[in-house]
A protein has these predicted regions:
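Structural detector for internal amphipathic alpha-helices that build alpha-solenoid repeat scaffolds
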Residues: 1-7, 29-40, 63-72, 87
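Amphipathic alpha-helical scaffolding segments comprising HEAT/armadillo-like alpha-solenoid repeats
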Residues: 7-18, 40-53, 75-88
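Hydrophobic/aromatic side-chain positions at a characteristic register within alpha-helices
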Residues: 20-23, 94, 106-107
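Alpha-helix N-cap/helix-start positions at coil->helix boundaries
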Residues: 22-29, 43, 55-59, 63
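Eukaryotic acidic, Ser/Thr-rich intrinsically disordered low-complexity regions
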Residues: 58-92
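C-terminal-biased regions
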Residues: 70, 80, 88-96, 100-104, ...
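Short helix-adjacent coil turns
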Residues: 102, 106-114
Length: 238
């Protein structure tokens, strides 16, 4: 059984990886900084470093390892991506959308670019009219590819330590009794009664409030956000 003790540098790389890969959420979060501090040791595991994780899933532990490698051992990430040109997490679009840019932005922690890419993909999923007008109507969400919305949510979840993504936003909304007026300040989209100014006042990093990204144009009202969070494909992920 895994202990609840504090992370320790006395763990071997194999032991550290095993704890990070299989621990409960609290244990895994307690190891986030240790994984970064010991990435040199962990890198010595070679291909075994990512072996415990499912490329078809959305395990944020794998996403964090990739982000830490990019921060400190970018050449190692390049080697990994040479073998996975579409990105380490396997994705498949029902409508032919290429998610390499989104996955690369998230891996590199360029969250502002990832957010812009996400908005563009949502317009693509909504159809030519949405692309022409530059935004999505809530009534267009129902016909969006559920598989593609799942891909977007998986990638945001995997590359945010499980803190961003549509399902995270939906979970927070549920915890707040379904009240959007409480959700907006909780996720940092509204401060002291005023909408957060885009893009300068948003926090484009892992230090952002939980649920901060991806953004949805709140000026279009609650209905667009509500339609997205309640899309059947995303409801199945909660």
């Amino acid at each position: 059984m895994l202990s609840g003790s504090s992370p320790t540098t006395s763990l071997s790389p194999d032991q550290l990886l095993e704890r990070f890969a299989t621990g409960n959420p609290r244990q895994r979060r307690s190891l986030i900084k240790t994984v970064e501090a010991r990435i040199g040791d962990l890198e010595g595991l070679g291909d075994g470093l990512l072996a415990p994780f499912d490329r078809a899933g959305d395990d944020w532990a794998a996403g964090w390892i990739l982000q830490v490698l990019h921060r400190h051992r970018p050449e190692r990430v390049s080697e990994v991506l040479d073998r996975c040109p579409g990105g380490w997490f396997k994705v498949e679009s029902a409508v032919g959308i290429d998610y390499r840019d989104l996955q690369q932005d998230l891996l590199q922690e360029d969250f502002q670019s990832a957010d812009r890419t996400t908005s563009a993909v949502l317009r693509q999923l909504a159809g030519p009219e949405a692309e022409r007008r530059g935004y999505v109507y809530f009534s267009e969400v129902a016909t969006m590819s559920g598989g593609d919305l799942t891909v977007i949510d998986r990638l945001w979840t995997a590359y945010s330590q499980g803190r961003f993504g549509f399902t995270t936003q939906a979970r927070l909304l549920q915890a707040l009794g379904g009240r959007y007026d409480l959700l907006w300040p909780r996720i940092g989209w509204k401060r002291e009664g005023t909408w957060t100014r885009y893009p300068g006042a948003f926090t484009w990093s892992l230090e952002a409030p939980e649920g901060h990204m991806p953004l949805v144009n709140q000026l279009r009202g609650v209905r667009l956000m509500d339609a997205l969070l309640n899309h059947p494909a995303l409801q199945q992920r909660r």
